């Protein structure tokens, strides 16, 4: 059987990335140019700046990915690209490059949903992983529990009703003066604190709902900080981070395990930037032990936005004959399962 090479392109937020993946699982290259340092002074991603940087970097990043893979552009079988959700200006840069290449080379174009890409990162890390399983996709923009019935069949079982988990990490990090991005900094700082020092709320909705809500938790953290400052008392940043992180992780892991029970599956997975959190990984493994659940998660570099996951997802779309035409447009609010 002939090897299938997919060129993946990802520009949905502040990473410019291109990757070549063979047969959906073997990464030949995965070039990622991050803009984190560029946006740090603003405390978050500035869409216009992100788009302009993508324009500057997209072709050099694509060329580098082909060079590292040791192939010529003509050798790729198809081009996969994120077309939503994300920042519309950022999405358009990657999409324009992918469409131009596909048209010029007469190669199939495959539009990939960003969240499907994050889920697919697990296939790269775990060569034997196959659906069905339930997956928690948690990042700065998303908090979803997804039932992965097949490589191209997804059901959202739960989602955030307000702030995404990663967004809450960013806001709390800013509140305690740790800067942006909040996830890695809080993870590191929390290791020095006591997770039981402050009893922050855990929101669980009734009626078997697996939805999340982190705005109340975020407000509780801000109220605690303001209260301590008004009383002229010092508070431990380490304890705040540890207690906040523990509250988030408790809810995420509880809901994911509940989803596995509801669907009767024995495999649970993590995906997205928050999936790199060390407590989330260890806590899920610990809770899954006595339940006969297998736990899967990608290496940290595959948790953040990257094109390898997009190429992987595109591969399974390609096998099913799902391709896009040159009229494919960026859809910033694209819902999972829409085509």
From Swiss-Prot:
Protein function: Required for the formation of a threonylcarbamoyl group on adenosine at position 37 (t(6)A37) in tRNAs that read codons beginning with adenine. Is involved in the transfer of the threonylcarbamoyl moiety of threonylcarbamoyl-AMP (TC-AMP) to the N6 group of A37, together with TsaE and TsaB. TsaD likely plays a direct catalytic role in this reaction.
Family per record: Belongs to the KAE1 / TsaD family.
NCBIfam families (UniProt xref): gcp_kae1 (TIGR00329), T6A_TsaD_YgjD (TIGR03723)
InterPro entries: ATPase_NBD, Gcp-like_dom, KAE1/TsaD, Peptidase_M22_CS, TsaD
UniProt name for this protein: tRNA N6-adenosine threonylcarbamoyltransferase
Chain residues that bind Fe cation: 114, 118, 305
Binding-site residues, substrate: 137-141, 170, 183, 187, 277
GO biological process, one term: tRNA threonylcarbamoyladenosine modification
Compartment(s): Cytoplasm
MF terms in GO: iron ion binding; N(6)-L-threonylcarbamoyladenine synthase activity
Cofactor section: Fe(2+)
């Amino acid at each position: 059987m002939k090897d299938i090479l997919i060129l993946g392109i990802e520009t949905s937020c502040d990473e410019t990335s291109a990757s070549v993946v063979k047969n959906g699982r073997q990464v030949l290259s995965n070039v990622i140019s991050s803009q984190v340092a560029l946006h740090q002074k603003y405390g978050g991603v500035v869409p216009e700046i992100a788009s302009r940087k993508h324009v500057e970097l997209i072709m050099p990043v694509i060329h580098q990915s082909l060079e590292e893979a040791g192939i010529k552009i003509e050798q790729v079988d198809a081009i996969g690209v994120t077309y939503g959700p994300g920042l519309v200006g950022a999405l358009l840069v990657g999409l324009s490059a992918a469409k131009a290449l596909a048209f010029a080379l007469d190669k199939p174009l495959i539009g990939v949903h960003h969240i499907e890409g994050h889920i697919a990162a697990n296939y790269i890390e775990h060569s034997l992983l196959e659906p069905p399983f339930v997956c928690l996709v948690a990042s700065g923009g998303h908090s979803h529990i997804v039932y992965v019935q097949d490589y191209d069949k997804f059901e959202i079982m739960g989602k955030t009703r307000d702030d995404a988990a990663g967004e809450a990490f960013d806001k709390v990090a800013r509140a305690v003066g740790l800067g942006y991005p909040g996830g890695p900094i809080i993870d590191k700082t929390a290791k020095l604190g006591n997770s039981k020092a402050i009893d922050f709320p855990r929101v669980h909705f009734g009626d078997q709902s697996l939805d999340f809500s982190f705005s109340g938790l975020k407000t509780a953290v801000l109220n605690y900080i303001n209260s301590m400052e008004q009383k002229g008392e010092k508070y431990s940043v380490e304890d705040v981070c540890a207690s906040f992180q523990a509250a988030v992780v408790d809810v995420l892991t509880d809901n994911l395990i509940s989803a596995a029970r509801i669907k009767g599956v024995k495999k649970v997975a993590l995906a997205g930037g928050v999936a790199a959190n060390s407590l989330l990984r260890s806590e899920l493994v610990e809770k899954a032990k006595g339940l006969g659940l297998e736990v899967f998660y990608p290496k940290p570099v595959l948790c953040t936005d990257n094109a390898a996951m997009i190429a992987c997802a595109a591969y399974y779309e390609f096998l099913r004959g799902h391709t896009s035409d040159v009229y494919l447009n960026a859809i910033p609010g694209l819902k999972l399962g829409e085509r």
